[in-house]
Every structure is written in structure tokens, then in C-alpha cells.
Amino acid sequence: MKPGIVVWLAAIAIRALPAQHSPRPIAIVIETSLGSIEAELDSAHAPVTVANFLRYVDAKRFDGGNFFRSVTLSNQPNDSVKIEVIQGRAAAGTAAFPSIALEPTSVTGLRHHDGTLSMARAGPNTATNQFFITIGEQPQLDFGGHRNPDGQGFAAFGRVTSGLEVVRRIQAQPVNAQTIVAPVTILRVARR
């Protein structure tokens, strides 16, 4: 068979295959006492992490929670690897759902760019109801980065689409070490 015919037949065969559609990003809004943050969650690349986050959203467990931690370049004197994030959590007194498996950036292909949403964790497979938002590029939070000694990084799962100025306003709140003195209330987190 001639090479041109083979290419033509291959092109026809590919067109005949059913289209593979990735899930569309899921839009959410995080309403805080300092303003709103809009974001898109990437369930196509981080399905386990997005499902976990949405479980808390749909159960309204982030409503009444807060941003309690602000990490800046100046308030981590004992850390050789510096990062910049704000960290939020579910409302006090709400039970955590079971922890989830870590979806490392080496698997998802997502990276910790400015405005990335990611899950906080201690060890691998321990993430539950705390998340953070990055300020600036944070490659040390990716797989192979050195912020967590295990080198597994953190599970990035979304990105801020509007409201980075609110993220920076939260980061600028007065802190005692890295704890925000008057935590910023999460009024509501909802799908848009």
C-alpha cells in the first residue's frame, strides 16, 4: 500500500473515533470578610483533590472557616526554602472527611504558579480540609521541591481567576509568627 494512502486512511480512522472531552474547569467563589476570590478547579488533572474540595464546599463546611495563616518571605526565619502562601480551613467544629491520596504535580502536570489552589498536608495521603493559595511562583511546592522533606510536593488543583488582590490583602494581615492575629473569615465557598 502506498504511504499516502496509509496516512489518508489513518486520518479518516482518527476522525471516526469518538471525541474525548476533558471535564470543564469547575468555577467557585470564596467569599471572605476582605472580598471575593474566584477560582477554577481542574478536575481533569486532579480529580481526587477536586472531588475532596467540592465535598467540603457542597457540605458548606468551609462556610464560617477562615484564612488563619500567612507565610511571607520575612516570617519564616528557620526555613531554608522560602514560600509565600495564605492558608485556609473549614469551620471550627466541623468534622473532617477521610484524608485523600496525594495527587503529586508529577502526575497531574499542574504547577504552583501565582494564585494556585493546593491542599495543605503533613505527610503524603493526609490532606483533608485545609488548603492554601500561592502568591508568586512556588516551584518548591511541586513534586521534587524541597519545602516538604519527603519531596512529594503538594496537590495543586485549581487557580485564582479573579481576586488576587484579595489574596494579597489577606497575606498582608498582621501576624504572630505565621498565624494571622485576626483570622480572615470565609463567609461562604460555593460553586458558580
Protein language model features and the residues they cover:
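Cyclophilin-like peptidyl-prolyl cis-trans isomerases
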Residues: 16-192
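Bacterial N-terminal signal peptides
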Residues: 2-16
